[in-house]
Amino acid sequence: TLRERVAELVGTEVAIDVVAADAVRGRVTGAGADWLGIESAAGLRAAVVPLAAVASVAAAESDLLRSARPSGRRPALAERMTLGFVLRDFARRRVGVRIAVAGNATWTGTIDRAGADHLDLALHGAGEHRRTSAVTGHRMIAYPALQTVHLDGGNG
């Protein structure tokens, strides 16, 4: 599966073409049940990309060939964690995020809550802490629309 192959690429430099957002380039840091983590080369701390949003993965030929051969290792706990689990952790830690969704919309803010199939985002400027005075609005975002979730290096 795509998830199994991406899990074999942990530590590898890749370019992820996302269906409806800008490509994400960086080092694969982990792969969960339905997401992958990237340490972004663009200067952001990290990004989470839902596997459903992945159009293609570019890597060195040797890395792609290696990913096609199962290593036989047992899945780590992180590989069983769902996207919702990861987003709930971001909500608990009050981490600032930049979220790109299908349709080329992008919002910055803090995840207030993450449910089984959607999240609530308090909108505020990048790098700002989530304070009532800084919040400019709220969005309820369905997980199937998520393309990328970048952690904000300014307030996490």
Name these PLM-found stretches.
Residues T1-R25, T29-T108, D112-H118, A122-G156:
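Short glycine-rich, low-complexity segments
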